[in-house]
C-alpha cells in the first residue's frame, strides 16, 4: 500500500477460476424507477489443464430525477458489458491467463439543481440542453505465474482503451448561456514483473518492476450562446513511467509471532502536454494560445511495519508508509501559474489490533491513524466560474479511529457494527487569489463520522419448499461533510436504511429488497459555478426483487 497513486490504498479484485469452479450463474433484478439488472456467467473446464469463463451483463434505469424543462428524467442510464477469461496450466508450476472485457455506458447527465441561497437545499432540476455521458471501455490482460524451487515469478501485462464523450449544460438553467463538451480518448499499456521467495523460514523477500505508457487526447469545447462564439481546447498528453521496488519480511524476530516488514519503492514519471486553444466565430477559427510543456517526477516511498501474532490468532500491528500522487496538467485554467499542479505526498501512521473473543463468536478490530499531507491536491473554481482546476494546499492532516465488530451471538445470526471518526483539517492553506486563509478548516468531501450496523438471520429448512430463508437489514450513517474549503456549506449527518428478504430452494434464490427505506433527504454532491450553488440529491426510496440461479 505504497507507491504511485496509492493515497487511498489498493483494492484487489478476485474472480472465480474456471479451473476451480464450474457452473452457470444467472441474475435477474428489477425495481421501481425502471431499474433493471441482468447478468449471465458460465465457467467451464476442458480437461485438467484448460478452462474458460464467458459472462455478460446489462443494466439500465429510467432515472430518478425529472428535468422540469424537458419533462424527462435527467439521469437515465443504460450500460452493458461482456467478458471472457481463459486459463491454461500446461505444467504444475506454470499458469497462463488471458482476460478481455468490453463495456459500454450511455447516461443522461448530471441531475444538478440550483440550491436555495439561505438553506442551501437543492430545488428541482431545470435546464434546457440535454446533458449526457457516454463511455466505451476495453481492457485486455495477460498473466503468467511460474513456481520455481524456493521462488515464484509473476507477470501482468495489460492494455486499456477508453473513449469518453460528455456534454453539460454548464449554466444549469432554462436559458441557453453555456454548453460544454469534452471528447477524450485514452490508451494505456502497463507491465509488472516480480519475483518473491516461497521457501519456509523466517525471511521472505520480494523484488519487482513496473512500467507504463499512457496517451490521452482530449478536446474541450465551450459554447457561449449569448456571445455567439465558442472556444475549443485540444490537449495531447502522453505519459510514461517506471518503478522498482523491494520488500523484506523477518518473522519470529526476537520472539515467536513478531515480524518486521520493510519496503521501498522508486517511481519515475515523465509527462508532456501539447496544448492548442482556438476561438471560433461565424468568421472562422482563430488560434489564441499554444504551448508544449513537459514535467518530470520522481519519488522514493518507504514502508515499515511491525506485527505481532498472538497464539490465539489475534494480532497487533503498527505501520508507517509514505504515499505519493503524481502532479500533472490542468485541463481548465485562467492563469499561467495554474497550468500545472505539483505532486502530493503523505506520511501515513497506523496502529491497530484484531482479536477473536467469546470462543470466536465475536471478532473485534480497532485502528488509529494519522495522515500528514504535503501539497494536497484540491479542486478550486476558476475565476470565470466556468470550471474547476487542481491546486496544491500547503499542508493538511487527517487523524481518527475505526472500530469494527463482527459477531455470531446465536446460530444463524450474524451481526456487524462499524464506526469511523475522522478529523481532517488544513494546517497551512492560503488562497492568494482571494486573500483567504483556510488554515484550521475541515477538508471538503471527508465525512466526520461513518457508521454502519447490519444483521443477517438465516433459518435453515423452514419448510419442505424452502432450503434456506434469510432476513437482512443494514443501516449506514454519514456526516457531517463539508463541501467547500471555507466550511460555510455542509451536508449534516444522514442515515440510510436498507433491507432484504430471500428464500433459496435447490439452485434458485428469490429476494425482495428495499433501499433508503425511510426516504432520507440528503445531498450526494455539491459544487458552485456561475455564482450559484448546485447539488445532486441522494437517490429516493427504491424497491425491487431478484431471481438468482446457480447450476
Say what each PLM segment does:
Residues 87-91, 101, 195-198, 204, ...:
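Structural signature of Gram-negative outer-membrane beta-barrels, strongest in the C-terminal barrel
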Residues 372, 412-415, 476-484, 502-551:
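C-terminal beta-signal and adjacent terminal beta-strands/loops
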Residues 196, 202-206, 254, 260, ...:
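Gram-negative outer-membrane beta-barrel transporters
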Residues 46-48, 59, 89-93, 148-151, ...:
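Outer-membrane beta-barrel channels and translocator barrels
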Residues 12, 20, 29, 40-129, ...:
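Periplasmic-side early beta-strands and strand-to-turn transitions of outer-membrane beta-barrels
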Amino acid at each position: 500500500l505504497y507507491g504511485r497513486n496509492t493515497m487511498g490504498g489498493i483494492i484487489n479484485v478476485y474472480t472465480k477460476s474456471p479451473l476451480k469452479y464450474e457452473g452457470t450463474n444467472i441474475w435477474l433484478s428489477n425495481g421501481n424507477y425502471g431499474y433493471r439488472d441482468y447478468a449471465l456467467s458460465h465457467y467451464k473446464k476442458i480437461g485438467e489443464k484448460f478452462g474458460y469463463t464467458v459472462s455478460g451483463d446489462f443494466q439500465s434505469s429510467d432515472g430518478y430525477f425529472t428535468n422540469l424543462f424537458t419533462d424527462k428524467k435527467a439521469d437515465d442510464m443504460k450500460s452493458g458489458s461482456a467478458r471472457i477469461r481463459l486459463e491454461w496450466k500446461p505444467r504444475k508450476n506454470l499458469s497462463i491467463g488471458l482476460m478481455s472485457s468490453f463495456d459500454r455506458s450511455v447516461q443522461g447527465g448530471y441531475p444538478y439543481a440550483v440550491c436555495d441561497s439561505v438553506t442551501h437545499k437543492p430545488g428541482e432540476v431545470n435546464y434546457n440542453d440535454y446533458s449526457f455521458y457516454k463511455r466505451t471501455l476495453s481492457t485486455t490482460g495477460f498473466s503468467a505465474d511460474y513456481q520455481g524451487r524456493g521462488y515464484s515469478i509473476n507477470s501482468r501485462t495489460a492494455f486499456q482503451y477508453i473513449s469518453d464523450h460528455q456534454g453539460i449544460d454548464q449554466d444549469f438553467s432554462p436559458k441557453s448561456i453555456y454548453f460544454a463538451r469534452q471528447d477524450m480518448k485514452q490508451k494505456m499499456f502497463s507491465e509488472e514483473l516480480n519475483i518473491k521467495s516461497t521457501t519456509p523460514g523466517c525471511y521472505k523477500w520480494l523484488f519487482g518492476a513496473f512500467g507504463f505508457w499512457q496517451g490521452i487526447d482530449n478536446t474541450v469545447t465551450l459554447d457561449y450562446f449569448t456571445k455567439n462564439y465558442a472556444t475549443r481546447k485540444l490537449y495531447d498528453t502522453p505519459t510514461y513511467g517506471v518503478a522498482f521496488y523491494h520488500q523484506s519480511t523477518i518473522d519470529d524476530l526476537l520472539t515467536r509471532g513478531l515480524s518486521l516488514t520493510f519496503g521501498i519503492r522508486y517511481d519515475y514519471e515523465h509527462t508532456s502536454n501539447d496544448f492548442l486553444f482556438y476561438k471560433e466565430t461565424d468568421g472562422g477559427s482563430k488560434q489564441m494560445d499554444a504551448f508544449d510543456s513537459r514535467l518530470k517526477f520522481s519519488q522514493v516511498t518507504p514502508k515499515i511495519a511491525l506485527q505481532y501474532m498472538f497464539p490465539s490468532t489475534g494480532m497487533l500491528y503498527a505501520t508507517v508508509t509514505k504515499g505519493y500522487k503524481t502532479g500533472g496538467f490542468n485541463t481548465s485554467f485562467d492563469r499561467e501559474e495554474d497550468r500545472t499542479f505539483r505532486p502530493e505526498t503523505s506520511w501515513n501512521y497506523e496502529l491497530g489490533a484484531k482479536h477473536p473473543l467469546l470462543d470466536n463468536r465475536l471478532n473485534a478490530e480497532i485502528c488509529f491513524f494519522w495522515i500528514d499531507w504535503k501539497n494536497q491536491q484540491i479542486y478550486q473554481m476558476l475565476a470565470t466560474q466556468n470550471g474547476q482546476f487542481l491546486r496544491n494546499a500547503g499542508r493538511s492532516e487527517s487523524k481518527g479511529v475505526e472500530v469494527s465488530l463482527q459477531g455470531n451471538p446465536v446460530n444463524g445470526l450474524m451481526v456487524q457494527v462499524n464506526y469511523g471518526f475522522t478529523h481532517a483539517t488544513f494546517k497551512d492553506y492560503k488562497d492568494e487569489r482571494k486573500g483567504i486563509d483556510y488554515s484550521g478548516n475541515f477538508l471538503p468531501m471527508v465525512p466526520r463520522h461513518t457508521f454502519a450496523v447490519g444483521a443477517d438471520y438465516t433459518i435453515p429448512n423452514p419448510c419442505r419448499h424452502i432450503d434456506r430463508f434469510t432476513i437482512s437489514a443494514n443501516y449506514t450513517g454519514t456526516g457531517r461533510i463539508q463541501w467547500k474549503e471555507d466550511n460555510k456549506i455542509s451536508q449534516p449527518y444522514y442515515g440510510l436504511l436498507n433491507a432484504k428478504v430471500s428464500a433459496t430452494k435447490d439452485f434458485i434464490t428469490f429476494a425482495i429488497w428495499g433501499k433508503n427505506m425511510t426516504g432520507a433527504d440528503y445531498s450526494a454532491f455539491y459544487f458552485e459555478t456561475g455564482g450559484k450553488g448546485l447539488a445532486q440529491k441522494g437517490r429516493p426510496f427504491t424497491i425491487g426483487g431478484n431471481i438468482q440461479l446457480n447450476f
